């Protein structure tokens, strides 16, 4: 519970800094994601565990990328291009395929990588695992768009955060569920704030 509260605290700070377009989104986020990699492994939410490991790597990438384009720790915001959307589609498809495969093979993995007495099949998927597959893809795309400083990242965060509220409540992670409720609210505020900033500092459209 203590680790969960600490992870929630730094996760909250990270989303707040993201809302402000402040580069501190990444160091605070790294602390949170590392803690949640351990917690999600413990709760057998492998999809979200993998996405938090991905968050850690993307946070380092985003930190470097933002540092090159930041002025007084505040970054320049832009809209998603056609090429970006193709990349998003590829990332989403990869995530859906990979995480589905991980859950499909879960009985084999939990049996110390032995097929003895193991039955594989989609009928063994838990309802929360289907949701986990979907939200993992949403968050993966959202994280990449945030690293690229695209305003549309907030749309993915809003949808993913909202879905995650009942998911973690079902898993008994009360503080994490509450965190995602706050994340949903902050993500909506972040989208509004970034949109206002973008309107005041227009960027030429790209194809």
Where are these regions (language model features)?
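Membrane-water interface of transmembrane alpha-helices
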Residues: 54-71, 194-195
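Polytopic alpha-helical membrane-helix bundles and their juxtamembrane interface segments
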Residues: 1-21, 25, 69-73, 77-207
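Early transmembrane hairpin module of multi-pass membrane proteins
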Residues: 11-14, 22, 26-62
């Amino acid at each position: 519970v203590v680790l969960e509260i600490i992870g929630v605290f730094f996760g909250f700070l990270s989303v707040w800094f993201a809302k402000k377009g402040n580069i501190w989104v990444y160091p605070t986020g790294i602390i949170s994601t590392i803690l949640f990699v351990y917690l999600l492994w413990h709760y057998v939410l492998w999809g979200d565990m993998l996405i938090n490991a991905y968050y850690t790597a993307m946070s380092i990438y985003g930190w470097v990328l933002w540092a090159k384009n930041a002025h007084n720790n505040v970054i320049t915001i832009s809209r998603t291009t056609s090429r970006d959307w193709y990349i998003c589609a590829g990332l989403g498809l990869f995530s859906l395929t990979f995480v589905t495969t991980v859950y499909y093979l879960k009985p084999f993995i939990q049996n110390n990588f032995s097929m003895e007495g193991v039955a594989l099949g989609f009928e063994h998927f838990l309802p929360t695992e289907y949701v986990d597959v979907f939200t993992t893809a949403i968050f993966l795309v959202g994280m990449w768009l945030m690293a690229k400083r695209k305003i549309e990242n907030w749309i993915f965060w809003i949808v993913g955060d909202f879905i995650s509220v009942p998911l973690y409540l079902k898993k008994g992670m009360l503080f994490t569920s509450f965190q995602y409720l706050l994340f949903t609210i902050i993500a909506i505020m972040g989208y509004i704030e970034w949109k206002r900033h973008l309107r005041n500092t227009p960027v030429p459209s790209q194809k």
